[in-house]
Amino acid sequence: IHPTSVISGYRYISENLIINTDELGRDCLINAAKLGVQVVITDPEKLDQIRYFVEAGAMAVRSVVPGGGAVEAALSIYLENYATSMGSREQLAIAEFARAFHNEAQVNPERKFATEAAITILR
C-alpha cells in the first residue's frame, strides 16, 4: 500500500516506503480500497494474500470505471445530465460539448469495449 493512502479517514504518511499489510487489518484496507487500490508485489510467495486484498478491495468499491476512454465517457454522461438543468441555449452548448467528449472516447477502436462498459456502469 502506498504510504499516502487514506486509511480510516486520515491521511497516513509513514517514513517507511513499504507498510506491512498485516499491521493494518482488514477494515483499514477496505477503507483505503474505497478510494483507490495500489498494490506493489514485493514477495511473490504471498500471492494468496495479494489475491485476498484485491478481492476485498473490489468488493468495497461500488463502481469501477475502466480505462481506455472511460474518463471521456463518464464526463460525457455527467455533462448530458447537467445540461438538462440549464436553459435552452446553455443546454444546447453543454450537450454539444458532451457529444464531443463521447466522440473522443469512441475514436480509437481498441478503446471501444472499455468505453461501452463504462457507459453501462455509469448509466
Swiss-Prot record:
Note one Pfam family from the annotation. Answer: Cpn60_TCP1
The protein's assembly and partners: Component of the chaperonin-containing T-complex (TRiC), a hexadecamer composed of two identical back-to-back stacked rings enclosing a protein folding chamber. Each ring is made up of eight different subunits: TCP1/CCT1, CCT2, CCT3, CCT4, CCT5, CCT6A/CCT6, CCT7, CCT8. Interacts with PACRG. Interacts with GBA1. Interacts with DLEC1.
What GO CC terms are in its UniProt record?
centrosome; chaperonin-containing T-complex
Q: Which organism is it from?
A: Mesocricetus auratus
**Which catalytic reaction applies to this protein?**
ATP + H2O = ADP + phosphate + H(+)
Give the EC number(s) under which this enzyme is classified.
3.6.1.-
Recall the GO molecular function terms of this protein's record. ATP binding
User: What's the name of the protein?
Assistant: T-complex protein 1 subunit alpha
* Function noted in UniProt: Component of the chaperonin-containing T-complex (TRiC), a molecular chaperone complex that assists the folding of actin, tubulin and other proteins upon ATP hydrolysis. The TRiC complex mediates the folding of WRAP53/TCAB1, thereby regulating telomere maintenance. As part of the TRiC complex may play a role in the assembly of BBSome, a complex involved in ciliogenesis regulating transports vesicles to the cilia.
Location relative to the cell = Cytoplasm, Cytosol; Cytoplasm, Cytoskeleton, Microtubule organizing center, Centrosome
Write down the top EC class of this protein.
hydrolase
Q: Is Endoplasmic reticulum a UniProt keyword of this protein?
A: no
The family note in this entry says: Belongs to the TCP-1 chaperonin family.
Question: Gene3D superfamilies attached here?
Answer: GroEL-like equatorial domain
Provide this UniProt record's keywords sorted from A to Z.
ATP-binding, Chaperone, Cytoplasm, Cytoskeleton, Hydrolase, Nucleotide-binding
Q: Which residues does the annotation say bind ADP?
A: G68
Q: What is its main location?
A: cytoplasm
Q: Taxonomically, which superkingdom?
A: Eukaryota
